[in-house]
């Protein structure tokens, strides 16, 4: 079974890491079947632009608390993407995350928190990204909706929870 093979390869019980590695296993397999050797992702956007509920919870602690959450989430994401690339390498595919480059991280951290999240009740978040999407012509239905993470939309999360 793929999930146990991945669990063994990445050697962690972290549910999110396992879910993401399973999802990218299939993404990489598909990319390879299409003769692609690189897949570019938007990983890092939620970490850098306050996309998680943890940022709502941290909001009352001000910028310093939000920065602390951001640094923790970025550290986890950078490590997880190494595991993802280990899985993708089976198909000779590289998963690239331009939003997790050190230069982009440095830039994103200069954007005011108020452009990312408005308050502790803000369910939409990532406002500057949504404004940019509108500006460049992304259809409204795409930039006004909350996104669903790959592991949830693909039902991997549910399947893994059921198998435990």
Residue ranges and their predicted role:
Residues 1-136, 150-162:
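ATP-dependent adenylate-handling active sites, centered on carboxylate activation for C-N bond formation
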Residues 138-148:
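Conserved S-adenosyl-L-methionine
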